[in-house]
Swiss-Prot record:
This is Serine/threonine-protein kinase mos. The active site is at D143 (proton acceptor). Belongs to the protein kinase superfamily. Ser/Thr protein kinase family. GO terms for molecular function: ATP binding; protein serine kinase activity; protein serine/threonine kinase activity. It comes from Gymnogyps californianus. ATP binds at L8, G9, S10, G11, G12, F13, G14, S15, V16, K29. The gene is MOS.
């Protein structure tokens, strides 16, 4: 039922593959066991599932998850998600994806095409719509950055990689004790840098 096709990338907590699941093209994230920080590995796996029951056009959808398959000595679990391609906003902004390299005669002058105002507005609206939905469900992403915004072939932005996310319980968001230091330091929210509580 699940067949891994090719690697798409890897990060601190695992690897992502293009795969097929019941005949549909999907992305599979295998969360690896960390010998250095086992608790962080487990927390990352379960944090990814914060969005498991949610469906929104601007959020990468979780299809299934398992702590058993595919069996691997080094894997904590597997998360099967909708396949949205492997182009991110990071590729678009910094011209790091081969798909976005346009040559030397472009507006950016660095082998990449500058974003048009229309693209910038559309991408911003997609991201804000996705964030508003997540916040309405009590979920804060905590690692929002261009590399975690995927762009589909149709040009729709989808928020992904919820390994640092946190589900705020009813009334808990007002607690001064709810703060998280996960995520990418250079993209961390100002309130977290100041040691304040998480806000949605």
């Amino acid at each position: 039922r699940l067949c891994l096709l090719q690697p798409l990338g890897s990060g601190g907590f695992g690897s992502v593959y293009k795969a097929t699941y019941h005949g549909a093209t999907v992305a599979v994230k295998q969360v690896k066991k960390s010998s250095k920080n086992r608790l962080a590995s487990r927390q990352s796996f379960w944090a990814e599932l914060n969005v498991a029951r949610l469906q929104h056009n601007n959020v990468v959808r979780v299809v299934a998850a398992s702590t058993c398959a595919p069996a691997s000595q080094n894997s904590l679990g597997t998360i099967i998600m909708e396949y949205v391609g492997n182009i991110t906003l990071h590729h678009v902004i910094y011209g790091t994806g081969d798909v976005w390299r346009q040559g030397e005669d472009d507006e950016g002058g660095c082998g990449r095409k500058a974003l048009s105002m229309e693209e910038t507005v559309c991408y911003s609206c997609d991201i804000m719509t996705g964030l508003a939905f997540l916040h309405s469900q009590g979920i804060v992403h905590l690692d929002l950055k261009p590399a975690n915004i995927f762009i589909t072939e149709q040009g729709v932005c989808k928020i992904g990689d919820f390994g640092c996310s946190q589900k705020l319980e009813e009334g808990l968001s007002q607690s001064p004790h709810v703060c998280q230091q996960g995520g990418t330091y250079t993209h961390r929210a100002p309130e977290l840098l100041k040691g304040e509580r998480v806000t949605a």
